[in-house]
């Protein structure tokens, strides 16, 4: 009950300042404290995906830790995995401030950060300095291109990040779907996506055979373009689909004073759209690769909807901002109750249940 009161105080401050304060605090969590405070895993929620073991489905989405590497503190919150990034080859400041806005009436955020990060070298140094024990679960690294890099040269940026960062990643994600880097989403078009992913998959396979490389897609693709992107990604050798990034749509928040701000919308207004994209990706992939569901995971019900729609794992960021330190524990406890209600023995049994007749009792 303390979190709502603390949140009301923090929400009086600039959102980016609060973000930095949170990182400052998380960096100072000793590993022993993180282990002691980490919620106990629930065996029914464990899942194996892409050759990796996850003690639950709920991970931290890219965008929160952009290379500061506060792993013990983040794992101490209960996340089963942490995705760092987006990381670019060279440091870049991102877009001008203000660039992060809260829409508390809608439990949403709107951002136009623009891949602000200190670059792959700084990230690699920090990851190299971490003791192995600090990795309380799989660590993903989400990579992108620098803003000044033209799309025709984008592959070089992604390959540079893969080259430098793959030793420290359990999996990598190619981010081509942020709305805050001009022209980036054009890399989702068929030919560009095919060339980029084939180059990335080949480069990683030569250096770390078997290490998974995923691609993160936008929620704003047409159904036909989404189907095509999934087909291209699988044919190119991607190990999974991350669905989705933030949306350019303002559906549900049209009348909010911030609705006219440029940037991507995340949080509760994205939940239904992102779940629909997960559902379509799962159907199109037809079991060939797993789907990681992201977008509007604000509670156990939202996470469960994505799992039943086909997500093997889910990720949250905005849900953490609104839900506070106890967010993951509450989601996991709620998921366990929902599995029991629908007579599933394990989370794996519920993945894609909405696509199967007789796949447990009707959700909701």
Swiss-Prot record:
List positions binding FMN.
62-66, 86, 142, 175, 216, 244, 267, 296, 317-318
**Keyword annotations:** Cell membrane, Flavoprotein, FMN, Membrane, Oxidoreductase, Pyrimidine biosynthesis
According to the record, how does the cofactor bind?
A: Binds 1 FMN per subunit.
Give the SUPFAM superfamilies listed for this entry. Answer: FMN-linked oxidoreductases (SSF51395)
Enzyme type, top EC level: oxidoreductase
Per the record, the domain of life is Bacteria
GO CC: one term? cytoplasm
Which pathway does this polypeptide act in? Pyrimidine metabolism; UMP biosynthesis via de novo pathway; orotate from (S)-dihydroorotate (quinone route): step 1/1
Q: Check the record and name the InterPro entries matching this protein.
A: Aldolase_TIM, DHO_dehydrogenase, Dihydroorotate_DH_2, Dihydroorotate_DH_cat, Dihydroorotate_DH_CS
Keyword Cell membrane found: yes
Gene3D superfamilies the UniProt entry points to: Aldolase class I
Subcellular localization is given as: Cell membrane
One MF annotation (Gene Ontology) recorded for this entry: dihydroorotate dehydrogenase (quinone) activity
Question: According to Swiss-Prot or TrEMBL, what is its membrane topology?
Answer: Peripheral membrane protein
Matching entries from Pfam families are given as: DHO_dh
Q: Which residues form the active site?
A: 178 (nucleophile)
State the protein's purpose.
Catalyzes the conversion of dihydroorotate to orotate with quinone as electron acceptor.
> What name is this protein filed under?
Dihydroorotate dehydrogenase (quinone)
Tell me which species this is from.
Answer: Anaeromyxobacter sp. (strain K)
- Gene that encodes the chain: pyrD
């Amino acid at each position: 009950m303390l979190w709502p009161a603390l949140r009301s105080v923090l929400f009086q401050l600039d959102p980016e300042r609060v973000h930095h304060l949170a990182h400052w605090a998380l960096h100072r969590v000793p590993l022993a404290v993180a282990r002691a405070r980490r919620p106990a895993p629930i065996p029914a929620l464990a899942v194996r995906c892409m050759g990796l073991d996850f003690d639950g489905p709920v991970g931290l989405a890219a965008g929160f830790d952009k290379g500061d590497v506060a792993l013990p503190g983040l794992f101490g919150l209960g996340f089963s995995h942490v995705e760092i990034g987006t990381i670019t080859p060279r440091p870049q400041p991102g877009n001008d401030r203000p660039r992060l806005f809260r829409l508390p009436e809608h439990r949403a955020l709107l951002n136009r950060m623009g891949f602000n990060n200190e670059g792959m070298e700084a990230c690699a140094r920090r990851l190299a300095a971490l003791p192995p024990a600090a990795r309380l679960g799989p660590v993903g690294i989400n990579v992108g291109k620098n803003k000044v890099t033209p799309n025709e040269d984008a592959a070089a940026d992604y390959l540079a990040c893969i080259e430098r960062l793959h030793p420290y990643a359990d999996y990598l994600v190619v981010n081509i779907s942020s709305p805050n880097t001009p022209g980036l989403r054009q890399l989702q078009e068929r030919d560009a996506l095919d060339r980029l992913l084939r180059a990335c998959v080949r480069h990683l396979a030569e250096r770390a055979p078997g290490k998974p490389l995923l691609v993160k897609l936008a929620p704003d693709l047409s159904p036909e373009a989404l189907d095509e992107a999934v087909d291209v990604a699988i044919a190119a050798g991607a190990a999974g689909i991350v669905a989705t990034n933030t949306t350019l749509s303002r559906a549900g928040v049209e009348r909010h004073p911030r609705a006219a701000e440029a940037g991507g919308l995340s949080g509760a207004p994205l939940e239904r759209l992102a779940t629909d994209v997960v559902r379509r990706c799962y159907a199109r992939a037809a079991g060939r690769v797993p789907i990681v569901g992201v977008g509007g995971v604000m509670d156990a019900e939202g996470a469960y909807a994505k799992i039943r729609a086909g997500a093997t794992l889910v990720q949250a960021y905005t849900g953490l901002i609104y839900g506070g330190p106890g967010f993951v524990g509450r989601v996991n406890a709620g998921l366990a109750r929902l599995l029991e209600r629908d007579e599933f023995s394990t989370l794996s049994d519920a993945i894609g249940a909405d696509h199967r007749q007789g796949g447990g009792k009707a959700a909701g």
